[in-house]
């Protein structure tokens, strides 16, 4: 059985989202950028609001962490920052690790396990 969700992917780049309008448009799921990088102050500025609005309106959500890691140690630090950012959240969808920054990808080796 195929399951299709009407979902969106959001971050600070979408600005202050009108989540009621999003829900009224039929969106049932969202992936929220929780943050990026390996410092705790790199939580997405809209993450708290976006997650609170999803919870308030019953929109199921998961999160992603945008990675700049180029070593396993950096990736572990990013994972710790992500876990700190999502503590206490009520995620219904997975935590995803977003690796698309080309300079970091080019430094990765298969042996790194990333």
Give the ranges of each region predicted by the language model.
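Substrate-binding cleft of extracellular glycoside hydrolase catalytic domains
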Residues: 2-114
